[in-house]
Amino acid sequence: MARIWASEAVADGGSAGGRVPPEVQRITGYLRMSAVSGIGFAVLFGAALVLLREAPGLGVPDSAYTAFYRDGGGGVLVTIGLYVVPFAGIAFLWQLAATRAVLSASARAHQSPPEIPRLLQLASGVLFVAMLFAGSAAVGAIALLGSFSVDPLPSPEVARALAATGYGLLFVFGVRAAGMYMITTTTLARAVGLFPRWVAVVGYLAAAFLLVSTTFHPAILLVFPIWTVLVSVVLLVRAGSPNKPPSH
């Protein structure tokens, strides 16, 4: 990234007069967009996770499912959580698009990102959102029935099966997609000098943890938004100091 700004400054006659080249302004805008949308995704995702966790877990007895939905436990918290999830996904798609725009701009500075990681980054990001939507819908399906249907609710066995489906989509497939997104984004950003080395190390370690983890504890779902916040802060710093090379 420093190479991009340096080449643009030379092409525009340096920083004489304090005028920022248009290309640098555009890339800085992409950096801010990626950072702001990334922080927005992390906040919305965390709020949705807290709300959806009000639903009974897989290890509780059938009586807990019956009591929870009979007493209206899913009427507010779980339903609101489901409505927050789409906005978290939308914010993440903005972050994905803005990040890819920054990486694409680096190609014009004679530093083309590798094509395979770029394709994998796009695929894993979209797959993560798909798993997030599908898994959340499965976990909150009974809560939606309780809020909008006049028919009797399904049996606890059905509720448990839907919850297990949602957990599988989120904790097995969604978590792995998030890990792959972290690996590819870190690789591409490091190749163009966007991330300092320590951020790359943190990203690779966190991604490896997501890829090999077998736990269904909800805390694992927080690894990805925490990494997103870290990356967003780095991008905001980069956007505020476009002429400063990345630290090593």
What kind of feature is each model-predicted range?
Residues 2-248:
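Hydrophobic, aromatic-enriched alpha-helical segments typical of multi-pass transmembrane helices
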